[in-house]
């Protein structure tokens, strides 16, 4: 009687060992792919802001997008931001009819040494005239080539090759008394935001 129970017990233990040996071993060398973990949430957001050009006078504007105050405020609730598209538009005002203006502009990396006097001699630079008797019915748009510069304008580290806008404007006839600009620059695009944070940061 005792021998029979011992045999049953031994067989039961052998069955357990056999079943365990048939299971896929769990190890770092398993051929099975690891399951994908949860992805960080992202949010695609449009943005737009405007700044006027100097009124009645020759002038230049340098706009490094990553450190521009309006952009920094827009991104303050997220730790990471990546541009998906970026454009600049020269938008004339009613004043431009009597005060024409020529505008040169270009998108370059922030570390670029290109100056306002070199815009038209640099790849991508454009010149746009607004105002006078003939005015474009639609704003002229200059797009940034994000393949030639770093689209990550906010990250755990800072980069020196994020987009920078250079603008040089020249009135047809300078006017010291003019207080309203003949045109404004409108910067707009879309940015992919991730890693939201509770406390705003620049």
UniProtKB/Swiss-Prot annotation:
<dbReference type="GO" id="GO:0039617">
    <property type="term" value="C:T=3 icosahedral viral capsid"/>
</dbReference>
<protein>
    <recommendedName>
        <fullName>Capsid protein</fullName>
    </recommendedName>
</protein>
<comment type="function">
    <text>Self-assembles to form a T=3 icosahedral capsid composed of 180 copies of the capsid protein. The capsid encapsulates the single-stranded RNA genome.</text>
</comment>
<keyword id="KW-0946">Virion</keyword>
<keyword id="KW-0167">Capsid protein</keyword>
<comment type="similarity">
    <text>Belongs to the tymoviruses capsid protein family.</text>
</comment>
<dbReference type="InterPro" id="IPR029053">
    <property type="entry name" value="Viral_coat"/>
</dbReference>
<dbReference type="InterPro" id="IPR000574">
    <property type="entry name" value="Tymo_coat"/>
</dbReference>
<dbReference type="GO" id="GO:0005198">
    <property type="term" value="F:structural molecule activity"/>
</dbReference>
<dbReference type="Pfam" id="PF00983">
    <property type="entry name" value="Tymo_coat"/>
</dbReference>
<keyword id="KW-1142">T=3 icosahedral capsid protein</keyword>
């Amino acid at each position: 009687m005792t021998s029979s129970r011992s045999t049953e017990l031994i067989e039961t233990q052998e069955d357990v060992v056999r079943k365990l040996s048939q299971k896929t071993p769990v190890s770092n060398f398993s051929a099975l792919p690891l399951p994908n973990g949860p992805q960080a949430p992202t949010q695609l957001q449009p943005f737009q802001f405007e700044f006027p050009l100097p009124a009645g006078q020759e002038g230049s504007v340098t706009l490094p997008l990553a450190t521009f105050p309006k952009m920094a405020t827009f991104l303050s609730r997220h730790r990471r931001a990546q541009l998906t598209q970026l454009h600049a538009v020269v938008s004339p005002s009613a004043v431009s009819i009597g005060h024409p203006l020529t505008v040169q502009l270009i998108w370059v990396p922030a570390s670029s040494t290109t100056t306002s006097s070199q815009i038209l001699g640099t790849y991508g630079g454009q010149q746009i005239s607004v105002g006078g008797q003939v005015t474009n019915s639609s704003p002229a748009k200059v797009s940034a080539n994000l393949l030639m510069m770093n689209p990550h304008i906010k990250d755990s580290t800072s980069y020196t090759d994020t987009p920078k806008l250079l603008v040089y404007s020249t009135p047809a006839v300078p006017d010291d008394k003019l207080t309203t600009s003949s045109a404004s620059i409108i910067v707009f695009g879309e940015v992919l935001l991730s890693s939201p944070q509770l406390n705003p940061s620049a």
